[in-house]
């Protein structure tokens, strides 16, 4: 069964808790023995953010903290070794952990995340906009993908409905026309074309703040992301 590492927390000198996004059961927490030996059946080094695993575990619901029976990694080629990709992986893993914590399993969402990691890991250049494209299309699986096509210039963007409007909404969750003018650019991006869009560091930060605030409005109990500021600084 496929799984993706989202987070690890040291539980004791001998154990850690690993949070995995699993294909079958969504987000699960596992108690795992800390073992750095190369002969270990399951190595601690495999539990880096966005590492993809093939795992087997006892899925009985009575066990809140589960145990892995077996695990085999699909080694990452570049993400752990390129600082920009590592920073992006830390952010996306934290983002997925926050958004997926109470969500039911979704094979389509899992496939999207799995394939996106593959793309980032094998991409050699021009990936600075990857996290923006990833977050935009991830929203589709939650049912609130924004419509970023502006009907005319000088429109407001309603964060609650996820659409542009020529009339300013009465609620405060709105982007003014000058704040929303970059959104149609984001809508035109995908993994194949995003390298064609040359954004400044400030523009990229602005779009990231938009996506973060948009999710915060639509996901209950959306926590503050510790890695957000670091990501903004790296891609400024």
Regions inferred by a protein language model and the residue ranges of each:
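Non-catalytic alpha-helical scaffolds and adjoining flexible linkers that form interface surfaces
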Residues: 1-236
């Amino acid at each position: 069964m496929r799984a993706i590492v989202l987070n690890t927390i040291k539980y004791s000198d001998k154990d850690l808790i690993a949070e995995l996004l699993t294909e079958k059961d969504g987000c699960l927490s596992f108690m795992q023995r800390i073992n750095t030996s190369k002969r270990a059946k399951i190595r601690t080094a495999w539990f880096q953010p966005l590492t993809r695993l093939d795992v087997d575990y006892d899925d009985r619901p009575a066990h809140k903290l589960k145990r892995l029976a077996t695990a085999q990694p699909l080694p990452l080629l570049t993400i752990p070794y390129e600082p920009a990709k590592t920073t992006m992986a830390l952010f996306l893993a934290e983002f997925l952990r926050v958004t997926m914590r109470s969500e039911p399993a979704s094979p389509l969402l899992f496939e999207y995340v799995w394939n996106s990691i593959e793309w980032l890991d094998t991409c050699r250049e021009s990936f600075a906009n990857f996290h923006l494209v990833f977050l935009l299309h991830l929203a589709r699986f939650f049912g609130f993908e924004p419509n970023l096509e502006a009907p005319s210039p000088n429109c407001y963007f309603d964060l609650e409905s996820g659409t542009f409007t020529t009339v300013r909404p009465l609620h405060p969750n709105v982007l003014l026309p000058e704040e929303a003018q970059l959104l149609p650019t984001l809508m035109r991006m995908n993994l194949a074309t995003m390298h064609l869009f040359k954004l400044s560091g400030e523009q990229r930060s602005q779009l990231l703040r938009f996506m973060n605030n948009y999710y915060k409005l639509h996901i209950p109990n959306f926590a503050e992301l510790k890695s957000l500021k670091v990501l903004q600084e790296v891609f400024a």
